[in-house]
Amino acid sequence: MLHGEIRWYRFGRPDKRHPVVIVTRSAAIDYLNETTIAPVTRTIRDIPTEVLLGAVDGMAEDCVVNLDHIQTVSKDKIGALITTLSEEKMKTLRQALLFALGF
């Protein structure tokens, strides 16, 4: 598991399995029991705290990373790799995360 990967995660009921982006820095992941994630959703609102993803990013359909809903979860609940975001897309994600946190 690495920073910038998109993986499957099963949220608590009634939600189902959704893709999430690993936000925790790679160097820390092996030392932690939990990791910070950002959910990926097909609900696109075109706001500064979203990062648009599509086929070029390895996703089956257009969607967004929603940085308004980051959370820290058990690594045990994180599933299979879907894709890894490019360095350029991670720069965009960083800006959206800073905006979401008020920086």
Predicted segments with their positions:
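Conserved functional hotspots at enzyme active or ligand-binding sites that engage polyanionic ligands
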Residues: 1-103
